[in-house]
Amino acid sequence: MKVTIDGRAFEAAEKATILDVARANGIYIPSLCEHKRLAPFTACRVCLVEVQGRRGAVPACGTHVEDGMVVTAQSPALDKLRRTVLELILSEHPHACLICSERTACPEHKTTIRKVGEVTGCVLCPNNGRCELQDVVEYLKIDRVKFPALFRN
């Protein structure tokens, strides 16, 4: 079956998702909740794309391709929508290191370690440097969160 993503035509397997086809062909669509060993969860909504003929944006991780489908995966409108979604997610999680302008050359270990040993900064996190959340924040160029922080430690 043929699928077009951002003007490029691809062959796709039946039951493949938009995200599967994009990744197989080197097109980056940010996502946080998708995992190859799990069924599509569509919880984070960061992988939203537009499908010609459908109203609104749909999650690429949970939308199966159809023959002749035309998908827009990259656009300023989608990036704005993804930024808003990610800012809402970050408003409920510790995010200071993720959006700090000094995050790539932090002069100190800017972390908060509570009595229980909880690390809320990226510097001491065992996934620092290979975290999908860091990649998505960088890709969407998020440098502030306009929603109030609601997380509890």
Predicted regions and their residues:
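Eukaryote-biased recognition of intrinsically disordered, low-complexity regulatory segments
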Residues: 1-8
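N-terminal cofactor/phosphate-binding cores enriched in small/glycine residues
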Residues: 10-67
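Fe-S ferredoxin-like electron-transfer domains
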Residues: 45, 54-153
